[in-house]
């Protein structure tokens, strides 16, 4: 008897409330078509209105509520006019990533037919790579402090944290992913010519890990020139692995090079499956367009496809569902309807319904 996967669906803020229903609509259709065993529960917290009412982003027992799920399907968080971003993010999304040890962040980058590319002369097939970001340590630590506030001697100190365990496990994941891809190529982002302690350590661990994967062609590139090459030579990349900060930058730049962040998905994984993994669009909550019904749901839907592939863990039904959703997305982008960010006039629901119809 096959396992029933439990999914917690959390809309969050802003357009998360608009795109999540379309993602759920597609998941329900995929479950029917490919006989998937999914149990979805919608939870109404981890958003700024909840904070305004309760003084915190999530209930005290959030960990206990969520730990029994297999995945979290998340919209977006943040509404800075209501709650400062550092409160909303550290009180929800970053808690999920760290407390559930979702140390791998995966962000695929692909240029689809029908999406206008801002890079001259690029066509579908030229841009198809994956950014692997370390998701739990690195530059985004809470280690630091502020002293002598209000005086001319005021200073702040923010520390980065790179552990051998943390660095090695993200590098291992990236090299193993590269082994599954036809090009078998990996690029490691660094800045060891300017950051004199943590980045040389990152380089050292990368070289040691690479020695275990002799079939992988790899190189390291400093983050500044790497960003330039994303724009100038995106076709040279296959798997790109980076620290938390550098991965954050690259995984927004990549989709922008492919035309729009509006269709970019991400996965926050605990590869060992001890805790639920989280799947979300790269785009934020976009309060400025909330309520206009023009948010592109494709990133949410594509994130759902990533979730099915991860949950299936080799099950052909779940892989077929992932591939089928991606094919439907490609057709809708090429044939319409599409939302204004892609140059169309379709609504959020128009796009969601069209993808369901394609399935």
Give, region by region, the residue ranges found by the protein language model.
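Buried hydrophobic packing segments
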Residues: 23, 27, 206, 300-308, ...
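Short glycine-rich or small-residue beta-strand-to-loop segments that form or flank ligand, phosphate
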Residues: 6-15, 73-78, 186-192, 305-309, ...
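Glycine-rich phosphate/pyrophosphate-binding loop and the adjoining helix
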Residues: 136, 142-188, 192-195, 315-320, ...
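N-terminal beta-loop-helix "entrance" segment that forms/cooperates
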Residues: 35-59, 230
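Glycine-rich phosphate/diphosphate-binding loop of Rossmann-like nucleotide-binding domains
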Residues: 8-25, 29-31, 151-224, 236
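Buried hydrophobic positions in well-ordered alpha/beta secondary-structure cores of metabolic enzymes
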Residues: 13-16, 70, 132, 174, ...
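N-terminal glycine-rich phosphate/adenylate-binding segment common to multiple enzyme folds
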Residues: 50-157, 245-247
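Glycine-rich phosphate/nucleotide-binding loop
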Residues: 51, 230-335
